[in-house]
Amino acid sequence: MARQTRQRILDAALLMFNAQGEPNVTTNHIADELEISPGNLYYHFRNKDDIIEQLFQRYEERMDTALA
């Protein structure tokens, strides 16, 4: 369940960053979009920078797989 919530946070954050621009999206916006508490979001990620780091890591992993 925790892994699923983590993936949902990453998916929502990516969509929101692309639609609204990363500087315009806060962790509270992401939590509101997913209808979870900010505390739940912070259980999975330290801050917005942590979310961004994980999105880049996920992108790298997908590119490595695609190019292999």
Question: How would you describe each model-predicted region?
Answer:
Residues 21-22, 42:
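Short amphipathic helical patch at the helix-1/turn junction of helix-turn-helix
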Residues 27, 45, 53-55:
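Short amphipathic alpha-helical leader/targeting segments
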Residues 16, 27, 38:
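Helix-turn-helix DNA-binding elements, focusing on the entry/boundary residues of the two helices
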Residues 4, 8-15, 19, 33, ...:
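Alpha-helical structural segments
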Residues 9, 30, 41:
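Conserved hydrophobic/aromatic packing and binding residues within compact polymer-binding modules
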Residues 35-45:
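Short hydrophobic/aromatic patch on the recognition helix
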Residues 23-32, 49:
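Ser/Thr-centered, proline-biased regulatory motifs
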